Amino acid sequence: MFRLKQLREERKISQVKLAMDLGMDQSCVSRYEAETRKADYDTLIAIADYFDVSIDYLLGRTDNPKINH
């Protein structure tokens, strides 16, 4: 995911902590950051909600992190 590592590092969250909070293995987080694994829609929602950003921002499709309602 385009901005996952950036968001995680800005908030000083380890891959292990993020993985635990989201109920996944650390290796999944690592692969998402390296873009060697694609997240399913439910995972994208969970990660975007965790960082309080839109999925479009997470994927680099917009520079606006806010969720538009």
Q: Where are the regions a protein language model picked out?
A:
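DNA major-groove recognition helix of helix-turn-helix/homeodomain DNA-binding modules
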Residues: 23, 42-57
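Short, charged recognition helix plus adjacent turn
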Residues: 10, 59-69
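A short, Lys/Arg-rich alpha-helix, primarily the initiator
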Residues: 1-10
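Alpha-helical residues within the helix-turn-helix
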Residues: 9, 20, 49
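DNA major-groove recognition helix of helix-turn-helix
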Residues: 33, 51, 59-62
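Short alpha-helical DNA-recognition segment
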Residues: 13-31
